[in-house]
Amino acid sequence: MAGTHAVTVDVLDRDGKAPQTANAEYVLFRSLDGAASEYGQLDNGHVTGRLAPGEYVVETGVHTPKPSGGKSFTLVYVSRFVLDKDRTVVLDARKGRPMSIGVDRPDARLTGGEGGGGYARVVQTIGGQTTTTASIFLDGQPAYITPSGPAPGLSLLLQGRLTKDGAATGSPYIYNVAGSVSDQDIIPAEPALRVRTAELATVNTRYRRQGRPACAGTHAGAHWPGGGYTTGFYVGIGSLPATRTEYFSPGADWDTDTVLGADCRLEEAGVTGTSELFPSAGTYDRERTTGPLGAGADFNTLLNDGTVQFWVPMFSSWSAASGLAPYDRVTGRTTLQTADGKVIATSDQPGYGDFTLPEPGRGSGEAAYKVTTDAYRQAPWSDLATRQHIDWTFSATRPSGDWTGLPLLTVLYRTRLDDDNRAPTTTQHIALSPRTNQDEPAPTIRRLTLQISYDDGTTWEGAPVSYTQHGWEATVRNPSGSNGKYVSLRAYAEDTAGRTVDQTLVHAYGLKP
C-alpha cells in the first residue's frame, strides 16, 4: 500500500516462548502526534500489517503461565518506535521488571479485596497532551513492566491501599499511597513505589453509629493526570463506632467515600463521598458517618430546550455528599410548580427529576418557580434523617447557550456529637452553612433562621442565629429528661439573588440520657 510500511510484531512471554493467543491478544500502536490508535490482533504472538510512517508508542500485555498454577502479567511498553521503513519489532516480556508498592511498616500489605488494592497507570505526552496510555490492576498475580524512555511526559504512576497483613476489613490502620516511581520521564529498571510513614498525612478518622448497630467500609482513589477514571479500592472498617488511623500521600486529590449498612455485607447501604487534599505531611482529624444529614450542594442544570435537570444529594453531611436518588430504603417525590402553585411536573424520587419549563411568552424574562421535595427514610442502619420536606424558590429563563447551572440554596449543619450521633442535654452550638451548586461562589445570605423540635416536628421553637467570625451559628439549650429523643431542625434562608429555601429535617441527631 503506497505511503505505508510493513510492520511485523513478534511477542515472547517470560519463558521466551510465543504466547498462545488467549495470553496475548493484541498489540497497540499509538501515534505520538495524537492520531488514532491502531490495534493488531495477535495470532499466537505474531501479527503483520502496514502503518503510516511516523513515531509510535507500542504496547502489549502478556500473561505467562506459572508451573505452580496461575499466571503472571507483563506490560511490554515501548515509548518511542520509529517507523521509517519496513520493520520488525520484538516485544519480549522477559525484560519486564516487577512492580511493587510498599511502606516502612513491616506488616502492611496491599489489600486482598476486589482489584487487589493496587493500580498502575502509564502516562505520556501524546499530541501535546498528557495521556493515559496503559493501566493495570495489581490484583495479587505477579505484575511486570518493561523499562522504557526517556520520552516527554513519560511516567509510571502507582497507587495502593495497604492494611495490616492485607486484611480486607478490620485493620487498625489504612495506607492510601500514590505517586510516580521516577521524576526523569522514564519507566525505571526498578518500578517500585516506596513510601515512609513520616512523609504521609496521618488522618485520625472517627466513624460514628447513627442510632442503630451498623457496619461501614470505605473506598479511596487518587486523581491522576492524563484523563481516565479514578480507581478506588475498598477496605472494610467493621462494626461502628470505630476509629482508624488512615494515611494519605499528601499533595494529591483523593476521591473517598464511606458506605454504611446494617451489617458488613452492605447489600443495602447509604453512601457519602468527597474529594480530599491533604497539603502536607502531618496530623489531621476528620469525621465520617456524622449527622446531621440533609440536602447538600446541588448539581442542577437548565438546558436551552427548557429541561431542568434537578439533582440534589439528599443525605449529605457537612463534609461529604451523598449520591443522587434512588436511595436504599428511601421513598419520596419532587414537584416543580409555577410561582402561583400550578404543578408543572412531578417525579417519584426525592431530590431528583428531569422537568421541562413552560414555553416563555414573547418578550418575557425570568419566571419564578418553586420546587418541593419530600424524602422518607426507614433504614435499618440509621435513625437519622427519617423525614425531610424542602421548598426551594428561584427564578430562571432558558439559556442562550446549550445549558447553564441552576444553583439553589441549601443549609447544612455541624455540631458536636458523641459516637452515637447524640448531643448532650446542655447548651449546644450549631454551625450553619448555606450552600449552593458546588461550582458556584458561596451565596450572600440576607436572612437565615432556625427552629428546633424535640417531638419529631409536631411543635417548634425558635433558636437565635448570629453571624460570627466563624460563620453562621445558633445556640440552643436541650431539655433534660430527653432519653431516646431526637432533635429536628427547620431552617429558612434567603440570599441577595432572591433564592429561598425552607427545609425541615426530622431526626437530625439524638440526645443523650
Task: Tell me the role of every PLM-derived stretch.
Residues 1-513:
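Low-complexity, acidic Ser/Thr/Pro-rich "mucin-like" tracts of secreted and single-pass surface proteins
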